[in-house]
Amino acid sequence: MKIGLVKTNFPGERRVPLLPKDIKDFKNEILVEEGFGKFLDIDDQEYIDKGCHILSRAEVFSESEAIFSLKLIQPTDYPYLREGQMIIGWTHPFGSGRLFMKEQALPKKLIVVDLDSNSPCIYYENEIFESGIPKGLLYKNSFYAGYAGVLDALLQYGFIPTEETKIAILGSGNVAQGAFSSISKYSSNIRMYYRKTMSIFKENYTKYDIIINGIEIGKEDDPILSFSEQKSLKKGTFIIDVAADAGNTIEGTHFTSMDDPIYENDGKYYYVVPNTPSLIYRNVSQDLSKILSENIFSEDCSRFLSIKS
């Protein structure tokens, strides 16, 4: 299968998901957009030496059966998408990619292979299929999201916590673990809450100075912090949503960006940057490339078409 890799044009994104050193005996033909590896100082010739074809962005879209885009494809690329084309990457169909699914994936009958860190699935014509991709494959990326996101949030906010700072972390998964690993360098006054102890958080949430969210709730679930509950938070409370579950886990929040990462509302501060692993893109690119090479690019991606049979 012809797989096209395009440079992500998602704001602030710098990760390079395929490095030349990891291209070995691929069963797919790889088409790469010119300048693909520029953030890591990788020349196009290094991809050519590994058997890849270097093309313009428009040519990659037009000649590829499948497009790999690390982050959600942006509206400027919508005209390039062809009916029945395969899209591989982090699409977040029920989150930030909801509009993409409605306006592009469904009308154009796109086959969307979503690389969700916990349960990678294939989305096609309002149906969801098992992808065969191992679950939890990209857990390190989620860990880095929590780790780097918390560091960035604190620096952008201009505050390093002390033992007097009361900190709550929602969740116990990879994102929450990364957040804990990061913020515990500065304070041990931390309480982690998960599903069984969330009722205790509800009894104490107004006491915290920093609330870190590492949970992405389901589309039918109630928010963990509603509008009314947020009003009860003390002035200056800092909410760091490293799960980037905008508007869901923390009701009414909206995405922020690396250029403008924090906003204030009613005396509370919110950080909801959706691609925090890119803050440490040099580390993350190494892990991503190895894992994606072994589990996505090396095997013929036409296997994902079996859902249509």
Swiss-Prot record:
Signal peptide: none annotated. GO terms for molecular function: alanine dehydrogenase activity; N5-(carboxyethyl)ornithine synthase activity. It catalyses: N(5)-[1(S)-1-carboxyethyl]-L-ornithine + NADP(+) + H2O = L-ornithine + pyruvate + NADPH + H(+). The keyword Oxidoreductase applies. Its EC number is 1.5.1.24. Homotetramer. Belongs to the AlaDH/PNT family. CEOS subfamily. Catalyzes the NADPH-dependent reductive condensation between pyruvic acid and the side chain amino group of L-ornithine to form N(5)-(L-1-carboxyethyl)-L-ornithine. To a lesser extent, can also use L-lysine as substrate (yielding N(6)-(L-1-carboxyethyl)-L-lysine). PANTHER family: ALANINE DEHYDROGENASE. This is N(5)-(carboxyethyl)ornithine synthase.
